[in-house]
Amino acid sequence: MADFVAAIDQGTTSTRCMIFDHDGAEVGRHQLEHEQILPKAGWVEHNPVEIWERTGSVLATALNATKLATTDLAALGITNQRETSLVWNRHTGRPYYNAIVWQDTRTDRIASALDRDGRGDVIRRKAGLPPATYFSGGKLQWLLENVDGLRADAANGDALFGTTDTWVLWNLTGGHRGGVHVTDVTNASRTMLMNLETLDWDDELLGFFDIPRQMLPEIRPSSSPQPYGVTVETGPADGEIPITGILGDQQAAMVGQVCLDVGEAKNTYGTGNFLLLNTGEKIVRSDNGLLTTVCYQFGDSKPVYALEGSIAVTGSAVQWLRDQLGIISGASQSESLARQVDDNGGVYFVPAFSGLFAPYWRSDARGAIVGLSRFNTNAHVARATLEAICYQSRDVVDAMAADSGVPLEVLKVDGGITANDLCMQIQADVLGVDVVKPVVAETTALGAAYAAGLAVGFWEGADDLRANWQEGRRWSPQWSDEQRAEGYAGWQKAVHRTLDWVDVE
C-alpha cells in the first residue's frame, strides 16, 4: 500500500493541502488565501472559481514539494468550511453567483419568518438546528429568489447546489465532464434540509424553502470504502487518487482529536470557535442554545451525533484588529500587544459582527467595545479581543454542561489561535480547567485524512488513531474563583449591551 494520505482543507480564509504518514505526522503542505468579498454590511462572499483554482494549486504544489506522485497516496480526504453555499451550472461548471459564506447575515428575514410562523420548531425537531442565517437552506432560498434564471435552471435540472466540499469534489472528479455531485452526512446536517434520523433530504423541509430536490447532492457517509470518485488524470493531481473521506471542518477536527467516545469534546479556534461534544449514536436535543448535528459516519456503521456550540467571530476578530483598526500588522502581534497590560482595564469586546451564534442565536446583536475610559490603550483592546475568544467559549461550555449534565474536566484545543500562548492561558483561567493541545494542532486536515485512510485500510481503526494522538502543550488555570466570576459577570453584562441593536423584521 502507498505510504501517505492527503487532505484538502478548504477553509474560510484559505485552502491548504496537507500530506500525512501512518503516524499522523505531517510530511508536507501548501496553503493559499482567497479574497473575502464584502459587498454590503453583513454580507460575506467568496469567489468559487478562485477557491477551485486555489485548491488545484495547493494540491499540485504539495505533491511537487514532497516529490510525491499520486501512486504514493493511498487516498485523499476533503474537509471544508461548512454551510457556505453556492450553485453552478452542471453543463458549463460556471457558478451563478458568488458563494454565500456561513458568516453572511442577508437571510435574517428568512430565518425570522420561519420562527414566527412555527416552521422553526419543525426544523429544530427534524434537522437539529434553529432557523438562523448561519445555515445553508436560507442561503439557497435567497439565491433562487434573487439570481436571474436560477429558479428555471434548477427546475430543469441544470443547476447544482453544494457546500464547498461538493464544489471541490465535483471539480476534482471531472467537473462538467462527469464530476461527482456528492456531499457527506456532516455537511448535509448543516443545511436545515436533512433529517437527522433518516440521513436524507426531507421533503417537508425542502418545501419550507421551496428548494427543488434535484439540485441537491447525494448524501454519503463521511468515510467510504467505495470512493466518491477519483481525481482525474487531467486535473491538478496529474493522476488518479481515490477520494474516500469528506467531513465538515469541525467534525473533521473531532476525528483528528480522536474524540470518538461519548463525552469527549474539543474546541477548534479558527475564523470562529466551534466546540463539539460526542453524544454517540443518540440524538440529544439541546435546551440551552446548542446545535444537534452529525459528528461522523464511517462506512456502513450507524451515525455518531454531537452537540455543538458554534461561535461566529473569534480569529476573525484578530483579523479585524489588523485589517480594519490597524493596531497590529500581523495576527501574532495580538499576543505581544496584549501582554503589555496585566488585565483588560475594564474593557470588554463583544465581536458580534454577524450577530451572536451559540448559545444566544441573536441576529439583532452587533459588535461593541464597552467600558472604555481615557486610561485605556490599544493593548487593552487587544487583551479584550483575546478574552472575547475565551469568554464566548465559556458561554458554550456552560450550556454544554447544562445539556449533558457532565461538567467539563479538560478541554482539547486545536486551530491557529492555539499558537497564541496568552490566549490559551486566558482560556484555562476563564474555564477553570486544563486546556490541552496536541502535537499536531491542525487537526481539521488530519481528521479528513483519517476518514479517507480508514476507508481504504491505511489505518485499521480507532486504536490506530488514538496511538497517534500526543499531547503537545498544557495550560492550567491561574485565576482565583473570585477573579473568574468577576470577569465572567463583566462579559455577560457586555453581551447584554449588544442585543436589540438591529431591527429584524
From Swiss-Prot:
One of its GO terms (biological process) is glycerol-3-phosphate metabolic process. GO terms for cellular component: cytosol. The lineage of its organism: Bacteria, Bacillati, Actinomycetota, Actinomycetes, Mycobacteriales. GO terms for molecular function: ATP binding; glycerol kinase activity. Key enzyme in the regulation of glycerol uptake and metabolism. Catalyzes the phosphorylation of glycerol to yield sn-glycerol 3-phosphate. Inhibited by fructose 1,6-bisphosphate (FBP). The keyword Nucleotide-binding applies. This is Glycerol kinase. InterPro entries: ATPase_NBD, Carb_kinase_FGGY, Carb_kinase_FGGY_CS, FGGY_C, FGGY_N, Glycerol_kin. Keywords: ATP-binding, Glycerol metabolism, Kinase, Nucleotide-binding, Transferase. ATP binds at residues 12-14, 271, 315, 319, 416. It catalyses: glycerol + ATP = sn-glycerol 3-phosphate + ADP + H(+). The gene is glpK.
